[in-house]
Amino acid sequence: MSEPKFKHLLEPLKIGNYVLKNRMCVSNSLPHFLQGPETYPADTVMAHYENKAKSAAIVTCMGINNFSHGKQLPMNLDFGHFPDYDLYDTNSQNYLLQLADSIHFYDSIACMGIFVGPPSAYPLMVPKGQQGKADPFAQTKSLNAPPPAEFDLMKIPAHEDPTYYTEEQFNLIADSYAEQAGILKMLDFDMISIHMCYRANLPAKMFSPITNHRTDKFGGSLENRMRFPLMVLERVRQKVGKNMLIEIQWSADDLEGGYTLEESAAFLNEAKKYIDIVQLRANEVDHAHPIGFELEETPFLKFGEYMKKNVPGLVIGVIGGFHYPATCDKAIAEGKADIIYAARAYISNNDYGQLVLEGRDDDIVPCLRCNKCHGRGANDPFVSVCSVNPCIGLEQKVARMQVPTKGGKRVAIIGGGPVAMRCAMYLQDRGHTPVIYEKGPQLGGAIIHADYAEFKWPLRDFKNFLIHQMDKRGIAVHLNTEATPEMIKAENYDVVIAATGANPMVLPIPGADPEKLFFAQETFAHPEKLGENVVVIGGGEVGVEIGIYLSRKGHKASVLEMRDRLAADSTAIHYYSMLEEAWEAEPNFTGITGARVAAIKDGAVEYIDKDGNTQSVPADSVVMSAGMRPNKDLALSFYGCAKEFYMIGDCKKAATIQQGMRSAYATAMRI
């Protein structure tokens, strides 16, 4: 009998009195829309974690924010990101017990994250410059107070001065950690995960010289700076005893001026007296969720390798970009990690773990690293979505959303973009026979440009996955074939699905000649056709990416945007700041906001600035990136070619990949 394809990743691991069924672990994550106002895990939340437990060895649940002395994160500031479970209410405890039990059903370790309130609530509630001026706990008495005027959702201050905490308060906080851990053990949780990274809460702040400027026994030397975090861990271990696993989420190193990798290892060698696992993370919260501009697939594996060598006897877990099982398996085989944590792998694939168990890694859908799973924007409802998995968070109802089918229908799909290909896969899974008609020489549609920009490698992986699936599944594809209603009608299909996409919009600007303008696809494919000075009209996410790409190709790119900031449509949380870093790193990139383009002239583009003045910027070439117009008329021309007719993707409404994937899935489930 052959061994598992990923034998190292699937090998059991003994930790204390527990045995992990494999090395696949789910880090703390949750589709935020699943949890309502309940102070206990909703049924939808339980269904979500149950699904992960079917294959993962450790399932970490989001997360307890309570403080046992009556303080916790105010409801109006938790953004829906963290569930507001009441650990001290007996009715809520009943549901928490059910959550642990549902994870145990699949022989998985039930783990709960702990985020003790005041150290996080304190900087949220105190205006900048006022931290530490009074009793920190007193600042949180008005739990429903609005945030201060200086408060910026995307720049939550993580730098309050811990100087003014007293030793008595340190003891209260440490006791609160221990008390919560004790209750979770009583509720049958096997493990707790204590957040101690990014200088985001008091234990992490106390260890970092960047935030700890104390001169007493809690500051200064390495021994003093580790005193409080070790106090927390010692209290927790004393409370729960030996028969509960304790993990810390830990930034392996720090920003410039902070602690070193060597100091980090020294702390972990002390902490291993109390903890079983360390989950190694980045030194900054946004970079802990790497995107396409991070060209290294798993940028933090090096920390695992270092700690494996320098902290013997502690189980080393790594996280950050671990998606492909071959990469995970190799990391363990080479002794760089003991266990692998992931969140986005399970978000982008409801059946991720099962695919790994079956060795079907080529059926794993790549993650786009767009981080829309954290929310769409700062001013939107904090709704998690996944760009490639339309079933995210639907575990409890996806079966009843599907229309019963016996299959057997012949379906013509007009268009060969990502939405068309994904719809064809879903249709085949339901027993139908899809046929794709693509007028161009290759599949890919609007995402073909991912082949050219190196930072679009996650999107390129997704495109190549879809094309590979067409070939692997034997789905009929007619390239270089411009379908007509007459052609489709003659084939006598049962269903016709129009996926005709959208075309770039040309704004009614004086001098805007479509024959002389460039658009995204051609710009990415042939940057050599553009002159030295390029003006990009439209500074949304696509326009900014065009500007970055051209800058890296040696052009001088000026991006004009009407709104008050560039890439305002991009993911605000754990994405925007890294995109901003990317364009700020390009000396040939210039972003101009509050700019209304007035005219395109020979060698220049004129615009009205935010003060109403006319300005001019040199332009040898002009790229129009002002949105897309759906090909509705073309799509509608296929109505009447079969008994059933549907429109999916951009031809209905120019939208995101996520919206297109949901459109493809929903339509296929109705046929």
PLM ranges: what are they?
Residues A57, S108, F189, H432, ...:
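Short phosphate-binding/catalytic loops that engage adenosine nucleotides
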Residues A326, T405-I436, H478-K489, T500-I509, ...:
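Rossmann-like dinucleotide/flavin-binding elements
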Residues D351-C367, T481-A502:
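Small-residue-rich anion-binding loops in enzyme active sites
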